[in-house]
């Protein structure tokens, strides 16, 4: 069978707020084109993606989404005409400019890099949804603002790294070079993708990619405390890891939390305030919210205790 005769299918789920990020992340790993929209009448989200029919990984990705979200969504499949689909898809995802410093582009785009920006190149199948997704954009904007604040970060970790885009952005932007970044994900295929993208972006020597469920792996704990932590996952897992994350954060350090909807901000923020972290900035991106939290330096803590 020729490449142009590949059979394609569109897969779709309809889920509530709390399951959106888990299912969208699952689709991103196995589909070339992922989109989502909110049905204002029902309050439910429609998530769909296009993939080669019969390729592996979908069932495993959906099982993980069900486990993470607690929502068992029905999968809806329809045939998709293959002719011209790839070209149409590429046209739908041009270079994404994020903030003042970043440009995200798929490997299907040619031409010189955008002047004055750090270009992050991702394989086309992975790039879809990365630069344009509200959570990813929010994290990149947060990183840009922290660096503009002249915060030097030496020990960085990206939890739930996915494509590795945030780890690569930190490796490219943070001074002094070269900063080492730990990039961890619960899924082996995400870690492999991050490794491949690190090579593509010439930062493989700065990224340490490994499979880990949160803070469980010894190499992650051994490198703590971190002065910058990315956690772009889900609202409830973010709440669940508030204690170990706060314990692994250097006094004076920052954490960038994402993967939560604006409606979940209060719940997540409360969990981290109980661990002594304070809100530095909230960055809304559509329905999504990114939080920058700060751990007070030791001197500030001692001053607060003595004044009490």
Predicted regions mapped to residue ranges:
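N-terminal auxiliary segments of SAM/dcSAM-dependent transferases
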Residues: 5-114
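Conserved hydrophobic residues forming the short capping helix/wall of the S-adenosyl-L-methionine
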Residues: 65-66, 198, 272
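Conserved SAM/SAH cofactor-binding pocket of Class I
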Residues: 126, 130-218, 225
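Short alpha-helix immediately C-terminal to the canonical SAM-binding loop
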Residues: 191-192, 238, 265
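Hydrophobic beta-strand segment of the Class I
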Residues: 229-230
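A short glycine-rich, Lys/Arg-flanked "PGG" loop and its adjoining helix->strand segment in the class I
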Residues: 239-254
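Active-site capping/gating segments
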Residues: 260-308
């Amino acid at each position: 069978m020729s490449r142009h005769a590949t059979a394609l299918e569109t897969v779709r789920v309809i889920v509530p707020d709390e399951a959106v990020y888990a299912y969208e992340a699952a689709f991103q790993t196995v589909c070339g084109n992922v989109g989502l929209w909110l049905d204002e009448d029902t309050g439910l989200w429609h998530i769909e993606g296009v993939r080669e029919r019969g390729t592996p990984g979908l069932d495993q990705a959906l099982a993980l989404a069900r486990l993470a979200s607690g929502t068992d969504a029905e999968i809806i499949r329809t045939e998709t005409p293959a002719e011209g689909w790839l070209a149409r898809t590429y046209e739908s995802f041009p270079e994404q400019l994020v903030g003042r410093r970043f440009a995200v582009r798929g490997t299907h785009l040619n031409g010189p890099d955008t002047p004055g920006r750090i270009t992050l190149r991702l394989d086309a199948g992975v790039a879809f949804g990365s630069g344009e997704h509200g959570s990813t954009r929010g994290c990149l904007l947060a990183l840009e603002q922290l660096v503009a604040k002249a915060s030097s970060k030496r020990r960085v970790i990206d939890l739930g790294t996915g494509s590795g885009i945030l780890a690569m952005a930190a490796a490219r932007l943070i001074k002094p070079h070269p900063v080492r970044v730990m990039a961890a994900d619960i899924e082996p295929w995400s870690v492999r993708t991050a490794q491949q993208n690190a090579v593509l972006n010439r930062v493989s020597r700065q990224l340490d990619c490994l499979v880990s469920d949160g803070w469980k792996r010894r190499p992650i704990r051994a490198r703590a405390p971190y002065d910058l932590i990315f956690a772009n996952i889900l609202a409830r897992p973010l709440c669940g890891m508030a204690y170990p994350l706060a314990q692994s954060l250097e006094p004076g350090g920052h954490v960038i939390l994402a993967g939560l909807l604006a409606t979940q901000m209060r719940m997540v923020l409360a969990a981290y305030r109980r661990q002594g972290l304070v809100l530095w900035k909230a960055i809304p991106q559509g329905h999504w919210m990114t939080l920058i939290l700060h751990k007070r330096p030791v001197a500030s803590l001692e001053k607060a205790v003595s004044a009490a």
